[in-house]
Amino acid sequence: MAVTVETLEKLERRITLILSADTIKNEVEMRLKRLAKTVKADGFRPGKVPMSVVAQRYGYSVQYEVMNDKVGEAFSKAANEAQLRVAGAPRISEKEGAPEGELAFDATFEVYPDVKIGDLSATEIDRVSTEVTDAAIDKTLDILRKQRRTFAQRAASEGAVDGDRVTIDFEGKIDGVPFDGGKAEGFQFILGEGRMLEAFEKAVRGMKTGESKTFPLQFPDDYQGKEVAGKEADFLVTLTKIEAQHLPEVDEAFAQSLGIQDPTLEGLRADIRKNLEREVKNRLIARNKSAVMEALIKVADLDLPKALVQNETDRMIEGARADLKQRGIKDADKAPIPAEIFHEQAERRVRLGLVVAELVRTNQLQAKGEQIGAHIEEMALSYEKPEEVRRWYFGDRQRLAEVEALVVENNVTEFVLSKAKVSDKQLPFDELMV
């Protein structure tokens, strides 16, 4: 087989493949003979169908299959001999003017780019850290108490205050006309928790059971309901029930109800601290990793293979369709999703993937077995049944591959931070946890 390689624009290459027509013909005949042993046809015993009938029925499909296989083999061999790192599948087209007894094909494709990474020591990156304070533990305790609160109906003479669970009937109109979502009966919400617009809650605050009130409400310009955004509505609200909340005391009985190993107040706070520190650690890793990846994108110079960008765009479109399907959208598989909306993000992902791969390759940052095991062990110990979590990960290659990818990203993050010009900054707990 003779091979010629042409360099086209940037990453694009073309290989001309020359195949022997006899090789194709012999392979087709061999496959047809093999097929004839199992073919069934009316009027013939199994395996006794004449070759002429087999060729007439299956000749075209077998020849197509053989051509695909042989061209694919020839392309792989030629690319390997030329030491080309092929990015994406080649476009194959038959070429005219081949010598007698031969077939010629052009394979047009892209190769992976040379990735040039700038001076990491001159790259500035902010590395954040966060401390789990007593105030953070107190706030978590308040959340746990609210999750276990009970409610008791208030006396008819008492007005609604923040923390109460109120039940209301309401109807809203714009210019005297009702609108979708503007009417409900027996609607419940906790006053003061921000589920409703502040102006709505302000109007309900202080109302008593059985009381009705009419008030205007201005919808924000960025309100999620586009049909009412920026408009003023008039609401009629009737308060049918007020229930005062009762928060459990933070005592040993409360600690026991949470099922912690040391059901004392000290044990409860220690358990909360441990969980918060684990969550803070994971969020800091993600945040600092994001800062590193953003820096890598800026410091790297490379051309992007169009095929890889297209493949990533296609994956993102399929992901969007799967999301629509999960939400119950009819005919989600056929939803027209413009590729342009994902193009920029797809380019970013491909660029970052190539840069990370280059760093891993040139600095031996591959995930080690003990790193993968330690990562899984850390996750497993955060669950009630660690052994089940271990089995869940180690029993599936795809899950292990996902953990391996995370470990590689962490290795890259640590490597870049060790080389870059890092500024350490303290981030408030609440800001990190948003």
UniProtKB/Swiss-Prot annotation:
Pfam families given in the database record:
FKBP_C, Trigger_C, Trigger_N
The record's EC number reads 5.2.1.8
Q: Does the keyword Cell cycle apply?
A: yes
What's the top EC group for this one? isomerase
Isomerase in keyword set: yes
Q: Please provide, in alphabetical order, the Gene Ontology terms of the cellular component aspect for this entry.
A: cytoplasm
Cell compartments where the protein resides: Cytoplasm
What keywords are assigned to this protein? Cell cycle, Cell division, Chaperone, Cytoplasm, Isomerase, Rotamase
> SUPFAM superfamilies of this UniProt entry?
FKBP-like, Triger factor/SurA peptide-binding domain-like, Trigger factor ribosome-binding domain
Gene Ontology molecular function, alphabetical: peptidyl-prolyl cis-trans isomerase activity; protein folding chaperone; ribosome binding
Reaction equations catalysed: [protein]-peptidylproline (omega=180) = [protein]-peptidylproline (omega=0)
> What is an annotated GO biological process for this record, any one?
'de novo' cotranslational protein folding
* Superkingdom of the organism of origin: Bacteria
Task: Output the HAMAP family linked to this UniProt entry.
Answer: Trigger_factor_Tig
Q: Which NCBIfam families does the entry link to?
A: tig (TIGR00115)
Domain remark from Swiss-Prot or TrEMBL? Consists of 3 domains; the N-terminus binds the ribosome, the middle domain has PPIase activity, while the C-terminus has intrinsic chaperone activity on its own.
Function recorded in the entry: Involved in protein export. Acts as a chaperone by maintaining the newly synthesized protein in an open conformation. Functions as a peptidyl-prolyl cis-trans isomerase.
Assigned protein family? Belongs to the FKBP-type PPIase family. Tig subfamily.
Entry protein name = Trigger factor
